[in-house]
Amino acid sequence: MGSRPCALGLFCCCSSCFCLCCPRHRPVSRLAAAVGGAAAVPAVVSGVTGLILSPSQSPIFIQPTPSPPMSPLRPGLDLVFANPPDHSAPLGVTRPSAPPLPHVVDLPQLGPRR
């Protein structure tokens, strides 16, 4: 995939970035016209998430950003599965190390309801 001449006479390195003025990526050129001279705007181009880098009114390039590695488990679940529950005590029996439950306090009535 080497460098190809761009529509504006520049070169497009399609392997590393997406040139929005290149005929190969022309469907995205509407996005470039809408963005104008923005410094860095998140965008999705052909399924690749990247940043639109445009320091001036020159052609806009989108450089793909690396995606974080996907974990098979959601964060926090690894701790749940790492420490399985201890079933040594039958259900309904409290352990001696557990703190006692607070006593229930009856609150006085605030007055008759109207």
UniProtKB/Swiss-Prot annotation:
Region: Homodimerization, and interaction with host AMBP/bikunin, residue numbers: 72-114
Record-listed Phosphoserine modification sites: 71
Gene Ontology CC entries for this record: host cell endoplasmic reticulum membrane; host cell plasma membrane; host cytoskeleton; membrane; virion component
Region (Membrane association) location: 1-28
Region (Interaction with the capsid protein): 48-72
Entry annotated with the keyword Transmembrane: no
Region annotation Induction of host SIRPA expression: where it falls in the sequence: 6-22
UniProt record, GO biological process: symbiont-mediated suppression of host cytoplasmic pattern recognition receptor signaling pathway via inhibition of IRF3 activity
Region: Interaction with host HPX, residue numbers: 28-68
Cross-referenced Pfam families: HEV_ORF1
Membrane topology: Lipid-anchor
Domain of life: Viruses
Annotated region (Hydrophobic), positions in chain: 6-22, 33-53
Residue ranges of the motif PTAP/PSAP motif: 96-99
Ranges where the record places region Interaction with host SRC, HCK, FYN, PIK3R3 and GRB2: 95-104
InterPro entries in the cross-refs: HEV_Orf2
PTM field: Palmitoylated in the N-terminus.
Coarse class of the protein's main subcellular location: host cell
Region of interest (Disordered), residue spans: 91-114
Domain remark in the UniProt entry: The PSAP motif is necessary for the release of membrane-wrapped virions from infected cells.
Similarity section: Belongs to the hepevirus ORF3 protein family.
Its biological purpose: Small multifunctional phosphoprotein involved in virion morphogenesis, egress and counteracting host innate immunity. Plays critical roles in the final steps of viral release by interacting with host TSG101, a member of the vacuolar protein-sorting pathway and using other cellular host proteins involved in vesicle formation pathway. Also acts as a viroporin and forms ion conductive pores allowing viral particle release. Impairs the generation of type I interferon by down-regulating host TLR3 and TLR7 as well as their downstream signaling pathways.
Oligomeric form and interacting partners: Forms homooligomers. Interacts with host SRC, HCK, FYN, PIK3R3 and GRB2 (via SH3 domain); binding does not activate the kinases. Interacts with host AMBP/bikunin and AMBP/alpha-1-microglobulin peptides. Interacts with host HPX/hemopexin. Interacts (when phosphorylated) with capsid protein ORF2. Interacts with host TSG101; this interaction plays a role in viral release from the host cell. Interacts with host SIRPA; this interaction down-regulates the phosphorylation of host IRF3.
Further comment: The viral particles present in feces and bile are non-enveloped, while those in circulating blood and culture supernatants are covered with a cellular membrane (quasi-enveloped).
Identification of the protein by name: Protein ORF3
Organism of origin: Hepatitis E virus genotype 1 (isolate Human/China/HeBei/1987) (HEV)
Upper taxonomic lineage: Viruses, Riboviria, Orthornavirae, Kitrinoviricota, Alsuviricetes
